[in-house]
């Protein structure tokens, strides 16, 4: 009887040891008792984030610039390489769950020379097949597979977040560059008007119609406007270099379109549900 209790006790200890070696449990999304419809969801649940970037930016020049950036940007290449690396690790961890088969082939040749034409050689061949299988007793291999899958999916989301960031940065820099072009064009028009004003002020001064003060004031306005041109040209050059850097190029001129003076914007943009916006956050998805 005592021996029977001892066996039961040992079995309980074994079960306890197995349960204590469990690494963790799979995550299950909790079920929430929420109402079918909220008062705040009467608006359209469609978000502007559901649209592709080429649907938002219809400028063909900008589209080509974004495509080149996504293809040649150095950070984007690193992210793509990281995805490939983790995809390979995922396949390796998945393969570790199954038996491993390997083979080896040996070839050997022995030769003996007894002098003269007395020559003897012996060749031998040997082949070996090795089968190994690690029993996943504690779940280490399964959890390693799950971890590699999570890392792989996280790298995809990181690449997606980088893509969205690059698209936004290129589009913003592009529109800022076009705005600087328009500003420079206005300044140059103003500069031409100032030059004409100085010419007329000089004629009036020489004709005795105005004092020298008016003529000098026109010259001051001309000089002040002229200083704006090199400053805007410098800003344009810096912005072009920024865009070229994002595209993985050396500093160069950036082609751009001329935007119309009147741009029609939608009266409202669909923002979607707050919960949907939260799920789109790159850090949450990753």
Question: Can you annotate each of these PLM segments?
Answer:
Residues 4-71, 233-282:
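Terminal intrinsically disordered/low-complexity segments used for targeting and assembly
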Residues 10, 92, 118-120, 166, ...:
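Residues embedded in well-ordered secondary-structure elements
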Residues 23-26, 52, 58-68, 72, ...:
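Small/polar-residue-enriched beta-strand and adjacent coil segments characteristic
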Residues 85-89, 222-225:
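A short structural micro-motif
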Residues 89-90, 116, 229, 264:
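A generic local structural motif
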Residues 150, 157-273:
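Periplasmic alpha-helical coiled-coil/stalk elements that build and connect Gram-negative outer-membrane
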